A protein has these predicted regions:
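C-terminal beta-signal and adjacent terminal beta-strands/loops
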Residues: 574-591, 609-610, 617-675
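Periplasmic N-terminal accessory/gating domains of Gram-negative outer-membrane beta-barrel systems
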Residues: 44-48, 54-109, 113-145, 154, ...
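Predominantly transmembrane beta-strands of Gram-negative outer membrane beta-barrel pores used
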Residues: 100, 110, 138-146, 152-160, ...
Length: 675
């Protein structure tokens, strides 16, 4: 080939690459492929149209705008429910609103907005999370919480760093809830984003919202406000979140009236400076959660109040391949403290408020060598002051090494020693947030865990297909589980010590996933095999037991198909049943039911199977605006999935039986508009 011909081809290739750069094909293209003709040569670039993007650190970045092409249950694709479709994240029943990552408890995970923790990240029944999807453009998910004082994973809703339009927004209105987001640029340097949401589930589903004939009333509202100041290298955010829930249930079997209100709030001020080699970020914040429960039965009543509030500082500096940071947090905690009224001889053992503090500093170094190898090593020094005034000091290392096989993928091995000084426990399987926090100290020593994992990730067919596999093992120390039921508060003197099982645990498993990332049809199939086992030191609990949330097998399938103005989506899940403790017998004494339980977590519910479907039609979709209508069906198979076991009374005969979610098939329709 002559030099002249080579020069001509090189010039055209350079022009083609410049065209790609200027048009931003990776993020802005609206078609799945881009074709450009160079004489008789055709080049094709396939667009990555999946919402999920993995990086070498092990974290997964998720575009919250793109996940809206997946099933819109009740009008939108909830970020937390989306995460539960990924391998290693457990599917929950409607009466368990937590997140369980690689077999860990819900409290082991760091759920945050802009890296600021949010307590109580789900509304009632787990159908809605605390996050309004339209307020957050991206979220980051990892099966490891990094250097944070958590034993599990991390889910962070990222802060917006810019607004593309002077004014934009979106809203949706449906049969169950409505939400809206408004974005404004105020001048050249100020940006404002406001979001709000409210539910009115009772209007449509009132007649079906019952548990064993007992009606339930429920409503919630939440909102976000984010102000951003951007000036050159500096950015300042003021970020706020609030949420409030209220529910009431009139239980007919035992003539129990239950009322519950709870809410959470978060406020933070962030400053970030991005230099040529150095990037730093500093945050001060407050975050809290409150739960207030009132239960009445005949002439007696019970009040249970608990809360946690945290004020703190976070700082981080990145310089070349080195990152370092510090975290300070002060906690005020009220563990669950039942107060009985109307019962002769009632002895209210008031649980004292707890004040404690924790701090840590860390450094991490990353090194790439021999082209194919990437090694990371870090060290964290942490300190904790318990409510009793005892000081704990700990050192926690972490290390990882990754080998790049180029077109055949990457293999990564990781180890870290985790620490955690806060506990969350309580009655978790009745659909109401009766769990509470308490600090390490007199009830239990600080938690720690050894975490080992090995993972493989690869892209094939020009990144159209992604394959991943991982194995993990966690050894956990100083674990707790709550035992007992709501009726125990009426029949005996309450002491938190009597309801806590203390011991150690093991989590291990395998996760597999095949993911189609581009084209009109995208989605994935994943399978997880995992065990979450606990061994307790308490008398009468010899042996090894499954954790309350354990599901041994789980299969997830997610698909989204685009056809012009139509978006079709579906998700399917099959999960093994969760364990529960069945009673050996129960009897009446002075009008109260006393229960004698059998082997702890010795029984299992039936497998959980659910299919969700969604159809979205866009009336108008262009650069200026978009509007359309969505029809979704939750649990399209109308399967009666067990969500809990409880005592039932029929024709004056008492039995212990399974109950399913009060609505088997839940359709919903909503209208949305974006501008």
């Amino acid at each position: 080939m002559s030099n002249r011909v080579k020069t001509s081809i090189e010039s055209k290739l350079f022009a083609f690459l410049m065209f790609l750069f200027l048009t931003g094909i990776e993020s802005g293209a609206q078609t799945d492929s881009l074709y450009m003709y160079l004489d008789s040569t055709t080049l094709s670039i396939r667009r990555h149209s999946s919402a999920i993007k993995n990086n070498d650190s092990g974290a997964t970045t998720i575009n919250t705008g793109m996940i809206q092409s997946l099933p819109k249950i009740f009008g939108n694709t909830d970020p937390v429910n989306f995460i539960r479709q990924l391998p290693g994240v457990q599917t929950n029943s409607e009466f368990d609103s937590g997140i369980h990552i690689q077999g860990c408890d819900n409290s082991h995970n760091l759920i945050s907005i802009g890296n600021i923790p949010v307590y109580g990240s789900n509304h009632l029944l787990g159908l809605f999370s605390a996050f309004i999807p339209s307020h957050h453009e991206k979220m980051t998910f990892s099966t490891s919480a990094g250097f944070a004082n958590r034993l599990g994973g991390k889910l962070d809703m990222e802060l917006t760093d810019t607004l593309k339009k002077p004014v934009s927004g979106e809203f949706s209105a449906g049969l169950i809830s409505s939400q809206g987001t408004l974005r404004m640029r105020i001048g050249k340097k100020h940006h404002l984003k406001i979001s709000t949401r409210g539910s009115y589930m009772n209007l449509l589903y009132k007649r079906w919202m019952q548990i064993a004939g007992s009606p339930i009333k429920y409503g919630f509202g939440d909102g976000n406000l984010t102000w951003l100041y951007a000036d050159g290298k500096d950015r300042i955010w003021a970020d706020f979140y609030f949420g409030a829930d209220k529910t009431h249930m009139a239980e007919k079997t035992f003539d129990v009236d239950l009322g519950l209100i709870w809410g959470n709030a978060m406020g933070a001020l962030h400053w970030e400076r991005a230099g040529t080699d150095v990037r730093q970020k500093h945050s001060i914040y407050y975050t809290g959660f409150l739960s207030d429960c009132d239960v009445s039965q005949s002439s007696s009543s019970l009040n249970m109040t608990s809360f946690i509030s945290t004020a703190g500082y976070k700082g981080q500096v990145n310089w070349l391949n080195i990152s370092a940071g510090a975290d300070l947090a002060y906690h005020m905690i009220q563990p669950q403290s039942p107060q009985l009224h109307g019962i002769i001889g009632a002895d209210n053992n008031i649980q004292e408020q707890q004040a404690c503090g924790e701090a840590y500093t860390y450094i991490r170094y990353k090194r790439i060598f021999a082209d194919r190898w990437t090694a990371t090593a870090g060290l964290k020094a942490s300190g904790y002051l318990s409510p009793e005034g005892r000081l704990y000091g700990d050192i926690s290392p972490e290390a990882s090494i990754m080998y790049d096989i180029f077109k055949y993928g990457k293999i990564k091995a990781e180890y870290n020693l985790g620490r955690q000084y806060l506990f969350q426990t309580g009655i978790s399987n009745i659909g109401f947030p009766l769990e509470f926090w308490f600090a390490a100290g007199k009830y239990s020593k600080p938690q720690r865990s050894h975490n080992i994992s090995l993972s493989y990730n690869a892209n094939f067919l020009h990144e159209a297909l992604a394959v991943s596999a991982s194995v993990y093992y966690k050894k956990l120390y100083n674990q707790v589980q709550y035992v007992g039921s709501l009726f125990d508060f009426f029949s005996s003197r309450y002491d938190l010590h009597d309801h806590l099982l203390n011991g150690r645990g093991w989590n291990y498993g395998v996760n597999l996933m095949v993911h189609k990332q581009s084209g009109s049809l995208t989605g994935w199939i994943s399978y997880s095999l995992g065990r979450s086992l606990r061994k307790f030191d308490n008398q009468g609990y010899a042996g090894i037991y499954p954790a309350n949330h354990e599901r041994i097998h789980e299969l997830n399938a997610t698909a989204s198909y685009k056809l012009r103005k139509w978006d079709l989506g579906g998700t399917f899940v099959y999960a093994s049943g969760q364990p529960f403790t069945a009673p050996e017998y129960f009897y009446m004494s002075s009008g109260q039911i006393l229960t004698v339980y059998g082997k702890h977590n010795g029984c299992r519910m039936r497998p959980y199977i659910r299919l969700d479907l969604s159809v979205t039609y866009s009336f108008i979709k262009n650069e200026m605006q978009e509007n359309g209508i969505n029809l979704s069906v939750y649990n399209a198979l109308a399967r009666h999935n067990d969500v809990m076991y409880r005592i039932s009374k029929e024709d004056n005969v008492y039995s212990y039986k399974a109950f399913s979610f009060f609505i088997q098939l839940m359709p919903s329709i909503s209208y949305y508009h974006k501008f």
